[in-house]
Design a protein with these regions (language model features):
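Feature recognizes metal-dependent phosphohydrolase scaffolds
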Residues: 1-290
Length: 290
């Protein structure tokens, strides 16, 4: 497998400046970012976990997309966590069409256990850079609402709050996050066999939600499709709840496939799952990825 070169030197000040510029661009943080794509494409990328080649591929094949949304988990687990984070952040700085939604690994709770803190320490940048990373975590939106009816979140719906209007009041600048509702949005998982909400398998404060809870949420909030990431899928994706929910996973650390979702709006509305090629040698670094 080919490793992509990355145009950064290990200079903490440069890296911190990149993160700070994106925080400045985000401005006043909002829990739910709202966008409209009336015609054209929107692309959604699931967990990349340091898969810089997948992130590069996603942007390279999405040059015609009006929106490219990375649905969280840019760091931890993989080989190029810091560079993957910086590449996506730099792309979001350059182009407003690139959006980052927060995942459960954009958190101080996970980085010490799943590799990101160790990577920063091995690069001798942890003390200088990590405070800037944490500040960024707290400014990322928990969800993206597209065209008022398509919701992208990392984990899933929360047992409480159950309305998007209430989601708009979730506290920001919360590095864990400690708010139970925000925590659930990042950590919860869907299951076909569950009635309502049941305690999850990922630890205290996490839940599984079933089709009845999902349908109640979507009907209450006018949502007709939910895009989420968070769970390893051998094929890179899985549809659930009669096709109204899709899980997208965009990393190969689990030895499975990596996939991205393209949606087209307008007279020819459709969805397309794109499986990322297994051989990185088939991927060229985009000269102008955004």
């Amino acid at each position: 497998m080919r490793t992509l070169d990355f145009p950064y030197l290990i200079i903490p000040e440069m890296m911190a400046d990149t993160l700070d510029r994106y925080v400045e661009k985000l401005g006043n943080p909002v829990p739910v970012r709202k966008m409209v794509v009336e015609a054209g494409e929107a692309t959604f990328v699931g967990d990349t976990h340091g898969a810089l080649d997948v992130s590069s591929y996603a942007l390279a094949v999405s040059r015609n997309s009006a929106l490219v949304c990375f649905v969280g988990d840019l760091v931890d687990r993989g080989k190029n966590q810091l560079y993957n984070l910086l590449f996506i952040v730099e792309s979001a700085i350059i182009s407003r069409r690139v959006v980052i939604v927060r995942g459960n690994h954009e958190s101080t709770l996970t980085n010490d256990y799943y590799g990101f803190s160790d990577e920063l320490k091995n690069l001798n940048v942890f003390d200088h850079l990590y405070p800037h990373v944490v500040r960024l975590y707290g400014r990322l939106p928990y969800a993206l609402l597209l065209n008022n009816c398509i919701l992208a979140v990392h984990g899933g719906i929360a047992s409480d709050p159950s309305s998007l209007h209430a989601w708009d009041s979730l506290p920001m600048d919360d590095p864990e996050p400690s708010n139970p509702g925000a925590f659930q949005i990042l950590w919860n998982d869907p299951r076909e066999y569950v009635d309502g909400f049941l305690p999850g398998t990922r630890g205290e404060g996490t839940y599984l939600f079933g089709p009845d809870a999902f349908n109640e949420f979507t009907e209450k909030n006018g949502i007709n499709f939910l895009i989420r990431a968070h769970e390893v899928k051998k094929s890179g994706y899985e549809y659930m709840f009669q096709g109204k929910l899709v899980s997208i996973f965009s990393s190969r650390y689990h030895k499975g496939k990596a996939a991205i979702l393209k949606m087209t709006f307008g007279t020819d509305s459709r969805q397309e799952i794109m499986v990322v090629p297994d051989e990185e040698d088939s991927i060229e670094w985009p000269a102008n990825p955004v």
